[in-house]
């Protein structure tokens, strides 16, 4: 039977995955292994996406079209790239870039993480609640996908501050675009060692997101990311005294202008550090970076509030009333 128009695309592939597994070529091989004819896969990688995006000057080898081409080695079904051309110029050969990187092109996009200096005091979770034990909304993550379930946890409040350390993992979102929004939430579903991770690679607003087991570790991780101009950092220890891995992303807080091989090495180190910390997931990068994706069910966190994605509504941090009071 004739298949309907089909696009094969990628989303959220970290640099280490691209270097080791591939990009669209990997998707193509998966599709062929699943039973799709190679010529259908080729069309779904090229012509159909170009038409869908109204990029009518590309997507097919034809006179007058843009010469964005990939020369494949061997059989089509293997989708083994040998030479890559962009605009008619050879830019890659056998998996290696063959063009000279031009300096100075990203300067206008650097220095875009606009937050104050990060210290422990910024990770005090202050609330307008009386002393006692209160029920708070929490986010529960899982080891498979990006679904975050709404949950609850009881935590003590004393002097207007939630005593969360040694009781739960905490996630904080801090606006990094010059705003003053800060939101906290407990995070359930992970048995983590002492430490923290901070990142500005956090869809879709890419604010400064920090997850940790102590205020000191969270401050250390976030300070590392801010010093790098954006990126990802994983720290170990109750005070975050050891940086386990870091991936600077100073271009808009989400990109790097350095060679792919180096970025891939750093991404692999971050992935390994997250897994060693206890962040068990099929894709740790995706799991961490989508806690703020407020269009993905079910409970997400932004710099303005927690969001009930199904109801499309902001929700408060507390659930019901306090259970005890001093």
Would you name each region that the model predicts?
Residues 19-33, 39, 43-326:
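Active-site microenvironment of metallo-dependent hydrolases
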